[in-house]
């Protein structure tokens, strides 16, 4: 899952792209190599949602790594309203009291990191690592929905 890239010199590791609901419950997870840009995994992450979505459009909060016209177009095509903070907008919105929503995904990443098997990747095959990430997501969903 890693390969040479002239900008980060073949950075090693794995990146988890997670789509969550407003409570931080994972709806979709895609893993890529650490040297893969976020833009390349955005459509795969949106397409891998397995729960049935409502017919009305839903809000989709994205960070600056997804600030591309292609991402906005693809998310609109999938009935999402993209909210991407463009460069320089973040400081202005903080001044007027706009609530940050990025912490929801960061908390979900923290929940993933509590599973020691995911914190440091020992698995050689990406399928095995994805299975462990999905198992962790199942436990997070169980704790979030069933246990409240």
Write out the residue ranges for each language-model feature.
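A generic structural signal for residues located within well-ordered alpha-helices
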Residues: 37, 41, 100, 127-130
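Generic helix-packing signal
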Residues: 46, 112, 140-142
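Polybasic low-complexity intrinsically disordered regions
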Residues: 1-87, 136
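Charged phosphate-binding loop/patch that engages nucleotide di/tri-phosphates or the phosphate backbone
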Residues: 132-148
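Helix-centered, glycine/charged polyanion-binding patches within enzymatic domains
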Residues: 54-126
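A broad, low-specificity signal marking well-ordered, structured residues that form hydrophobic/aromatic
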Residues: 16, 103, 133
């Amino acid at each position: 899952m890693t390969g040479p890239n002239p900008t980060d010199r073949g950075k090693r590791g794995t990146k988890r792209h997670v789509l969550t609901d407003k409570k931080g419950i994972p709806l979709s997870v895609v893993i890529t190599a650490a040297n893969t840009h976020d833009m390349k995994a955005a459509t795969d992450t949106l397409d891998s949602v397995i729960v049935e979505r409502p017919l009305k459009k839903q809000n989709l909060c994205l960070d600056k790594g997804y600030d591309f016209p292609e991402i906005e177009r693809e998310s609109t095509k999938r009935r999402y309203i993209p909210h991407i903070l463009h460069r320089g907008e973040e400081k202005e919105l903080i001044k007027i009291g706009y609530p940050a929503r990025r912490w929801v995904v960061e908390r979900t990443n923290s929940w993933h990191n509590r599973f020691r098997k995911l914190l440091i990747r020992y698995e050689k095959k990406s399928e095995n690592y994805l299975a462990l990430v999905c198992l962790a997501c199942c436990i997070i969903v169980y704790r979030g929905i069933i246990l409240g």
